[in-house]
Swiss-Prot record:
This is DNA polymerase sliding clamp 1. Forms heterodimers with PCNA2, which then recruit PCNA3; does not form homotrimers. The heterodimers interact with RfcS homotetramers. Heterotrimer which circularizes head-to-tail (head is at N-terminus, tail is at C-terminus) to form a toroid; DNA passes through its center. Replication factor C (RFC) is required to load the toroid on the DNA. Heterotrimer interacts, probably via this subunit, with flap endonuclease 1 (fen), Hjc, Dpo4, and XPF. One of the sliding clamp subunits that acts as a moving platform for DNA processing. Responsible for tethering the catalytic subunit of DNA polymerase to DNA during high-speed replication. Heterotrimer stimulates the Holliday junction resolvase Hjc. DNA polymerase I, DNA ligase and the flap endonuclease may be constitutively associated with the PCNA heterotrimer forming a scanning complex able to couple DNA synthesis and Okazaki fragment maturation. Belongs to the PCNA family. Pfam families: PCNA_N (PF00705). Signal peptide: none annotated. CDD domains: PCNA. The gene is pcn1.
Length: 249
């Protein structure tokens, strides 16, 4: 049996909503270190990882590691109840699945929902082990504009370094998109260890950026020479939502 309390119900369901961009069912793994969920698209191009360490949880108790598989439609029924940042969310294991309590700490209002879930063994949390030479941080709104633009002109986007700038391009002659990103214009941070360039699916980039919605925090994007792109946002109340996009070689 397990019981966890996360201090921000809105952030927690932003995690869940992000994963639904990749899968129709969600597997939550409860371990001694915290909670994680990892999902791949069928073509194995896009990976979504939710990772919430136990030290950011208001309460965390677990008898033994376990996983629960939830249907997305069931989870989305309760998303509307988690609109307040003042609300906490409590997950408790039951014989048939999960009991979810959303409690508004300001008003004292409480909602309790029971969801059926398939229980199983904890999955292995594996992700690409690569050294990414380029890292930059910006707001989700900036990435959202880029994602919308590149998908309008082509199926593939190319990202590269050019001196102290990031260059993003897509499309062919006559229908082409080019953007340059620099420190403070509009990047918050920029680190280039070595020059690099790589190409990715524009649609998968758009799907990953869509998964960032709901997190009011800057996003870090990392890439290397023909290596997977990593998109990482840390929730205000703790925990990371990470997307990996395989390169087009």
């Amino acid at each position: 049996m397990f019981k966890i309390v996360y201090p921000n119900a809105k952030d927690f369901f932003s995690f869940i909503n992000s994963i639904t961009n990749v899968t129709d069912s969600i597997i939550l793994n409860f371990t001694e270190d915290g909670i994680f969920s990892r999902h791949l698209t069928e073509d194995k191009v896009l990976m979504a990882i939710m990772r919430i360490p136990k030290d950011v949880l208001s309460e965390y108790s677990i008898d033994s590691p376990t996983s629960v598989k939830l249907d997305v439609s069931s989870v989305k029924k309760i998303l509307s109840k988690a609109s307040s940042k003042k609300a906490t969310i409590e997950l408790t294991e039951t014989d048939s699945g999960l009991k979810i309590i959303i409690r508004d700490e300001k008003s004292g209002a409480k909602s309790t929902i029971y969801i059926k879930a398939e229980k199983g063994q904890v999955e292995q949390l594996t992700e690409p082990k690569v050294n990414l030479a380029v890292n930059f941080t910006t707001d989700e709104s900036v990435l959202n504009v880029i994602a919308a633009d590149v998908t309008l002109v082509g199926e593939e986007m190319r990202i590269s370094t050019e001196e102290d700038k990031i260059k993003i391009e897509a499309g062919e002659e006559g229908k082409r998109y080019v953007a340059f990103l620099m420190k403070d214009k509009p990047l918050k941070e920029l680190s280039i260890d070595t020059s690099a360039s790589s190409s990715y699916s524009a649609e998968m980039f758009k799907d990953a950026v869509k998964g960032l919605r709901g997190f009011s925090a800057p996003t870090m994007v990392s890439f290397g020479e023909n290596l997977p792109m990593k998109i990482d946002v840390e929730a205000v109340s703790g925990g990371h939502m990470i997307f990996w996009i395989a390169p087009r070689l």
